[in-house]
Amino acid sequence: MFLSAVFFAKSKSKNILVRMVSEAGTGFCFNTKRNRLREKLTLLHYDPVVKQRVLFVEKKKIRSL
C-alpha cells in the first residue's frame, strides 16, 4: 500500500494572525500575530484618527501562520 500526504494529519501552527480593532469607535484596525495558546489580546496602541493611544481588542482570527 502506498501512503500519500492525504493520510497524514496536519499539525497546527504555533502562531495566528488576528485583527485588532480600536475601542474608540474610529474603525481603525491593524493586524498582529499572537501565540495560539494565549488568551485574546487587548493592548494600548496609537490610533491616528484620534491621535492618541487607545485600547485595541482582538475581534477575529484571520489565518494561521
UniProtKB/Swiss-Prot annotation:
Task: Transit peptide span, please give it.
Answer: 1-8
Q: Please provide, in alphabetical order, the Gene Ontology terms of the cellular component aspect for this entry.
A: mitochondrial inner membrane; mitochondrial large ribosomal subunit; mitochondrion
UniProt subcellular location = Mitochondrion
Principal localisation: mitochondrion
One of the entry's Gene Ontology molecular-function terms is: structural constituent of ribosome
The keyword Oxidoreductase appears for this protein = no
Q: Which GO terms describe its biological process?
A: mitochondrial translation
Q: Which domain of life is it from?
A: Eukaryota
What are the record keywords, sorted? Mitochondrion, Ribonucleoprotein, Ribosomal protein, Transit peptide
Would the keyword Mitochondrion turn up in this protein's UniProt record? Answer: yes
Report the family membership.
Answer: Belongs to the bacterial ribosomal protein bL33 family.
Q: How does it assemble?
A: Component of the mitochondrial large ribosomal subunit (mt-LSU). Mature mammalian 55S mitochondrial ribosomes consist of a small (28S) and a large (39S) subunit. The 28S small subunit contains a 12S ribosomal RNA (12S mt-rRNA) and 30 different proteins. The 39S large subunit contains a 16S rRNA (16S mt-rRNA), a copy of mitochondrial valine transfer RNA (mt-tRNA(Val)), which plays an integral structural role, and 52 different proteins.
Q: What is this protein called?
A: Large ribosomal subunit protein bL33m
What organism does the record attribute this protein to?
Answer: Homo sapiens (Human)
| Organism taxonomic ancestry | Eukaryota, Metazoa, Chordata, Craniata, Vertebrata
